[in-house]
Amino acid sequence: MPQYVHTNNSSFAIPYNGSWAHLSYFLSAGHTTRKWVRDGGFDILHLHEPETPSLSHKPLVMHDAPPMVATFHASIEPYPRALRLFTRYLRKYLSPLREAIFVSESAQKTAEHYLPQQVGIQTIPNGIECDFYRRAEPNPQWRGNPEAPTIGFLGRMGEERKGFTVFAQAAKIVHEAFPSARFLVAGDGQEDGEKTLDAIGADKGLRERFEFLGRVSDADKARFYRSLSMYVAPQTGGESFGIVLAEAMAAGCPVIASDLDAFRAVTEEGSSAALFVNRDANDCARRMTELIEDPARRQSLSQAGSIRSRSFDWNTVVDEVLEVYAKALS
């Protein structure tokens, strides 16, 4: 653990927005966080998701906290009626913020329900290290070729919104026409993935073409993208940005993605990726088939994605964040 990282007690998980949110709202956590802020002597404090009852919520009630900026990531559509009950509370407790950053327009639409009007706003995407992905060496065991293309999925298979069921259904269709295609799956939940293959009636031939890699390191994730013939992002909702798309594009991997608003924004309405109708496995399979059959199209998407990913490079994003800090300090 780097010396600049300070941990704060344990957390507990609750279901939230189709996933799990890990919160830390113990009394001791509040005391430790406030002490850390006071002892740090910071010029500015950058919070993430301060609307959640967790660590980033604590400094908002401090009378001696430094100027605060917050980044909002969540995208919830439609906005739940139950959360509207907390609007007045959140506007009061978020009032100490000077500036707010949204990772996308969809994140802004969600936060506008409770963000005080006097807070300055700016949309700045999540940042990635493009060179880290571009320079990664492909893994020969994962690398596809014209006779046996490799099609990748990365995500938690046990979360419906990550779209593994859509991916598996599309793979079943593609396997019938291209039995040599391989489907590489990285992420937690192999048991859930196996159950999904059972549910869609996958035969032995299809199962043999699936390879579950488990959770991968950052280095192996970059090699994963670099090794694929194409990467599929079949998420069904709850996404405010789509950082996996940006990472894959930075690696030069052709991307196929569901047409969520967030993914449309990242790919500039599909100019740097092949979009398919959300939750439609047949349309996803159609896109896979098109790219398998058209190497020139794959190369075109690879180049377009690589160019687009530069918009998310930290060398660009950090300057935008520093401008927000300057506003907060002025």
What is each stretch, according to the model?
Residues R215-V216, R223-L228, I243:
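Short alpha-helical donor nucleotide-sugar binding micro-motif in glycosyltransferases
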Residues M230, P254-A257:
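Short hydrophobic beta-strand element within catalytic cores of glycosyltransferases
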Residues G158-I173, N282:
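A conserved mid-protein helix/loop that constitutes part of the nucleotide-sugar donor-binding site
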